[in-house]
Amino acid sequence: MLTNHRSPHWLRHSARWPGFLVLALPILLFSPLAQAASAGELDLTSSLPGFIAVTLFLAAYVLVMAEEKLHMRKSKPVLVAAGLIWAMIGWVYVHAGLPDASEEAFSETLLEYSELLLFLLVAMTYINAMEERRVFDKLRAWLVEKGFSYRSLFWITGILAFWISTIANNLTTAMLMCAVVLKVAEGDKRFINLCCINVVVASNAGGAFSPFGDITTLMVWQAKLVEFQEFFELLGPALVNYLVPAIVMSLFIKNRKPAALEEHIWLKRGARRIVLLFLVTIVISVLCHTMLNLPPALGMMTGLGFLQFFGYYLRQSLPRSLERKRTRYSQRGDWRKLESLGSVVPFDVFTRIARSEWDTLLFFYGVVMSVGGLGFMGYLALLSETLYTGWDPVWANIVLGLVSSVVDNIPVMFAVISMEPDMSMGNWLLITLTAGVGGSLLSVGSAAGVALMGQARGIYTFASHMRWAPVIALGYVASVVVHLMINADSFAIFH
């Protein structure tokens, strides 16, 4: 790391760091990864361009938090902020005679983002493909048809949300389980609300111990701070985080049985094979990272190639498949299935890619590059010294988990990785856990909670979630205590 901290006389500013900490701290907690965000040769933390950069990012994030009211995509403000921040850095470094330093820092930050972009793009494509092949609809229909009691349904949707979120994003998982609850709940608002809270907590907890469960865990794994198999040490704490509030809430659910509903859903052709290809892709990406020391994105992109070949096979063989099914259904007199063949459309991989959450991916770029710029100016190194030197890392990580209930956990984790604190594996696992499950404390603390407020509008609300916040907080504390107890040895391990 270059730490010369030279600053041209025309950049010096009378304001000093302690007074600026009040403004900078909340901003930098909102920020991302960019391992290239190490402080540059020039210390710009007390300069006018530095103050402008922080103000730009703060203003952009205020607009992001007002996304619902402004009806403006969250990627817009951070994309502009990232461009302006790096433009100022480039201008300063060119005038200081150091153009290569800023170019190299930008390129390294962009490379880190690109690897994550490719990984997430493939994962989203597979999830979209499984959704289009009706894999999730089939699961929902199966749950609806079984006629489980309310208490059983509460536990089944929670447990499924916990495990599905280890490979699928918590947003998809939560909305799938909420759809089941809304279908069978017969307008029981209390039951719907408790199930929504349970699903949000479960999906966030499930993603906390899997490298594929959340963007935050993916980044910790890709940064080689925690090895793939080491994440599973968080399984016990994550289960405790989910089970403590779930057990308490289940006591308030009447054990009556709703009427069984009949819903016929057929998997589209190739659905099971796409699920298998997704699992194979995950295995390949893990092997690339652990055995070949190559980025996981390589394995994911290879898996995308497999999906494209399989999509080609589905398209080429579709006419023959339709003809065989028409003959079979006609002979059996199954007119319902015969009629459904008229709506069959060919599988197209690029349509699934186009349906990825591009606003999220572009927002991700804006935050990564913005914080990469702020880190290159020297702010993250300064904050790291304040937070992780002034405090015990355990307490710092617990507090940052609480911060993630208000601020999206992706920027929180990115900020920590960018600070590069010297922490044990146990502490890296701790921040992974707290940043992952801290969002459950408030309904707005995770994408799952925000989505369910819209899906169960007027039933699951910010206030209804807050009423159970003490129980959720109890689960948060219990999960931290369990981690400190059962994984005590990991706090002596440094990678």
Curated annotation (Swiss-Prot):
A GO CC annotation given for this chain: plasma membrane
Location in the cell: Cell inner membrane
InterPro entries named in the record: Cit_transptr-like_dom (IPR004680), NhaD-like (IPR045016)
UniProt keyword list: Antiport, Cell inner membrane, Cell membrane, Ion transport, Membrane, Sodium, Sodium transport, Transmembrane, Transmembrane helix, Transport
Name of a matching Pfam family: CitMHS
Keyword Cell wall biogenesis/degradation: no
GO molecular function, one term: antiporter activity
Domain of life from the UniProt record: Bacteria
rRNA-binding found in the keyword field: no
Induction section of the entry: Induced by hyperosmotic shock.
Gene Ontology biological-process annotations: sodium ion transport
Record's bilayer topology term: Multi-pass membrane protein
Bilayer-crossing regions: 17-37, 46-66, 78-98, 110-130, 153-173, 191-211, 233-253, 274-294, 295-315, 361-381, 398-418, 428-448, 468-488
Record-stated family: Belongs to the NhaD Na(+)/H(+) (TC 2.A.62) antiporter family.
Physiological role: Na(+)/H(+) antiporter that imports sodium into the cell in exchange for protons. Can also transport lithium. May be involved in adaptation to marine habitats.
PANTHER family per UniProt: SODIUM/PROTON ANTIPORTER 1-RELATED (PTHR43269), SODIUM_PROTON ANTIPORTER 1-RELATED (PTHR43269:SF2)
Protein name (Swiss-Prot/TrEMBL): Na(+)/H(+) antiporter NhaD
Organism: Halomonas elongata (strain ATCC 33173 / DSM 2581 / NBRC 15536 / NCIMB 2198 / 1H9)
Lineage of producing organism: Bacteria, Pseudomonadati, Pseudomonadota, Gammaproteobacteria, Oceanospirillales
